[in-house]
Amino acid sequence: SLAGRNLTYDTWHYHHQNLDFIDLAQAIPECTMILDHFGTPLGVGTYRNYRDEIFQEWRTEMRQLAKCPNVYVKLGGLAMPDNGFGWHKADRPPSSDEFVAAQKKYYLHMIECFGPERCMFESNFPVDRLSISYPVLWNAFKKLTADFSADEKQALFYGTAERVYALTD
């Protein structure tokens, strides 16, 4: 098993698969699992006109997932085209302020549910570069956490990833 080998399980899936992931996390509590890209709340195709409904459903599912102490979350990937913000088609990419205005509610909800000690920022590059530049994305993360404590910022920008992935000796 992954847990027996001190390995983690990362998953990237779409919002309509969140309940299956919750079942998996509950079934194998000894395995450390990482949810990538927020469980991607889709905003394209048949989902493009349901952003508010999907957000409400997603919020409820993330609260439920946060009850699984073996689950951590990577906060990033919302700039990719799948989420339906349309930045990859725009005349110019969003500024960090525009990014924060559009996506703050997703980030803050995850941090509220899981706590900074179970969240880590991630860039999802090179895919995100279709919509946003690397420096602008990380500046947006800094703006999102402007009112956070030094310990909370340390967890989000480095500490959680260091601990979960055993990046130190």
Which functions belong to the PLM regions below?
Residues S1-M120, S131:
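Catalytic pocket-lining loop regions of alpha/beta-barrel enzymes
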Residues K105-H109, C113-M120, V127-D169:
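Mid-to-C-terminal alpha-helical segments outside catalytic/metal-binding sites
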